[in-house]
Structures are given as structure tokens and as C-alpha cells.
């Protein structure tokens, strides 16, 4: 998993509340088990018409936000059915940080497991970032995970909280497999010890 230390990029505003996982990545795109290739279908039913043409007014179709790295969203983001494809699609598009007043628990946890930093902030601070994000290509925001600080286009800063263990994993690029491999020697030693103490297993 790619490390997350400091992220600087355009922030895209999506102030809708209750954006569910089917809106993030519709069910017809869940057949794949690959983490790549889903970015083009992120928010598919909002980004495209039924005949596949781009909806020009949708935020990620606007020239200023096509390369957005940060998404500033509304409350209860990622609600609905559990699907890990949702953070896969967000990450494959190029977004590595989602900021919102609240998240659905499963989506929130899945983000950390896939190298995406979800940040919960009070509504008034999210509103400030939404105002900043509406500047288009001038909406350059920096997220410093080590310092736990967001810096807006005007130089103002906002502190945020993050679980220390999840912070450690993101800073070091550790997913569940990476964490397991860190303990490979201890796992091997345990297996050898068990063979001796319990050979019938």
C-alpha cells in the first residue's frame, strides 16, 4: 500500500448528504476483484447520462476538478451496503483523502485499509473547506498526516483527529497483509514451536 504522509492537491466539493456506496460505485461494477479500473465509474450515475455522455455540471467532470486528490463531502458519507469497491473506486480515481462531518462505519474502516484517509470534522469546518473547494483549480489544500493538520488555500489551518494505530499504518503504507508480514519471523517461530509441542496438529 502506498504511504500517506503529506497530500497536496485540488479539493473537490460534494456537499450532498447520505451519499451511499451504490452512488459511489453502482452494483453493476462489482463483478471485478481488481482494485484498479474502477475510477472511471466513480459516481457513475451522477457523472454520466444513460447513453454514456458526461454530465457537465457534475463536479468531477469540471476541468478544475478532474485531477482532484481530496473530496470534501456531506454528512453520512459512504452509507448503505458494505462494498470495498467504494474506496477502491475513490482511490483509483486519484482521491486519497475524504473530509466529511460523518461517515458510515464500515466505509470509514475500509478507507484506512485501502490507503485513503477519511477525516471527520465539525460541520462548520467542513463548510469552510467547501467554500475553499469552490474556488476550482485554486482550491489547493494540504493534508499533513504526521502533524494532523489541514491547510487551506488561504493558509488557515484546521487540526484533525486520527486513531494512532491507523495513522501509523498509513504513514508506513501498511495494509493487513503488510502488518502480517512484519511479524513473519514470529509466526514462523510459533509454527515450529507448535510442531514440537503438538505434533498431532
Curated annotation (Swiss-Prot):
One of its GO terms (molecular function) is 3-isopropylmalate dehydratase activity. It holds the Pfam family Aconitase_C. GO terms for cellular component: 3-isopropylmalate dehydratase complex. It is an enzyme of class 4 (lyase). Catalyzes the isomerization between 2-isopropylmalate and 3-isopropylmalate, via the formation of 2-isopropylmaleate. Belongs to the LeuD family. LeuD type 1 subfamily. PANTHER family: 3-ISOPROPYLMALATE DEHYDRATASE SMALL SUBUNIT (PTHR43345:SF5), 3-ISOPROPYLMALATE DEHYDRATASE SMALL SUBUNIT 2-RELATED-RELATED (PTHR43345). NCBIfam families: leuD, PRK01641.1. Heterodimer of LeuC and LeuD. This is 3-isopropylmalate dehydratase small subunit. It comes from Paramagnetospirillum magneticum (strain ATCC 700264 / AMB-1). The gene is leuD.
Amino acid at each position: 500500500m502506498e504511504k500517506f504522509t503529506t497530500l497536496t492537491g485540488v479539493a473537490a466539493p460534494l456537499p450532498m448528504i447520505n451519499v451511499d456506496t451504490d452512488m459511489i460505485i453502482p452494483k453493476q461494477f462489482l463483478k471485478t476483484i481488481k482494485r484498479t479500473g474502477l475510477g472511471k465509474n466513480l459516481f457513475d450515475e451522477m457523472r454520466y447520462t444513460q447513453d454514456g455522455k458526461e454530465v457537465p455540471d457534475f463536479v468531477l467532470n469540471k476541468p478544475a476538478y478532474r485531477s482532484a486528490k481530496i473530496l470534501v463531502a456531506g454528512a453520512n458519507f459512504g452509507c448503505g451496503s458494505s462494498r470495498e469497491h467504494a474506496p477502491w473506486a475513490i482511490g483509483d480515481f486519484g482521491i486519497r483523502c475524504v473530509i466529511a462531518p460523518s461517515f458510515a462505519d464500515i466505509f470509514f474502516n475500509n478507507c484506512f485499509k485501502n490507503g485513503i484517509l477519511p477525516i471527520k470534522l465539525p460541520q462548520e469546518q467542513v463548510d469552510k473547506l467547501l467554500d475553499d473547494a469552490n474556488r476550482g483549480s485554486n482550491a489547493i489544500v494540504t493534508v499533513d498526516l504526521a502533524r494532523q493538520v489541514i491547510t487551506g488555500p488561504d493558509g488557515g489551518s484546521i487540526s484533525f483527529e486520527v486513531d494512532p494505530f491507523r495513522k501509523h499504518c498509513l504513514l508506513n503504507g501498511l495494509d493487513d497483509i503488510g502488518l502480517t508480514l512484519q511479524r513473519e519471523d514470529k509466526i514462523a517461530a510459533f509454527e515450529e514451536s507448535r510442531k514440537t509441542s503438538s505434533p498431532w496438529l
